[in-house]
Amino acid sequence: MTPINPFRKLPIGIQEFEKLRTEGYLYVDKTAFVYELVSTGAAYFLSRPRRFGKSLLLSTFKAYFEGKKELFKGLAIDSLETEWNVHPVLHLSLNAEKYESAEHLEGILEAHLQKWEEMYGTNPGTSTFATRFMAVLENARKKTGHGAVVLIDEYDKPLLKTYHD
């Protein structure tokens, strides 16, 4: 971990928690809030305007649920969390594509689903996106002993892209 420096770099445009922490960028500690969320609820829908730090927050959740304790050294959550259980994390970011058609979105979802099926296995007889995804969640839990965490970033980008079409 980079030592504390009062003249740390500003993380302009950086949305990866791990990069902020390992490369010495300034980070405003919101990990007490992260701990509160993961300790008190099951599912959350976080809606904020663009550029309000949603991607960074999801990246922080990802590191937390992957058990990357070393990244949280010196932050509030370091003294709050005692278990640091590792969970399977299914992270889907819909930010990078243009979404010219429904088929394009389906192709992206299919690619992610295939990757997760390779990691956690498939169930015979599952054919729809929904049943395949539910099978991945169940298989991930069976394989790891912990429930899967699903993080979806920029969920609204395909909707916004096609809203005026």
Language model regions located:
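Phosphate-binding site recognition
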Residues: 1-165
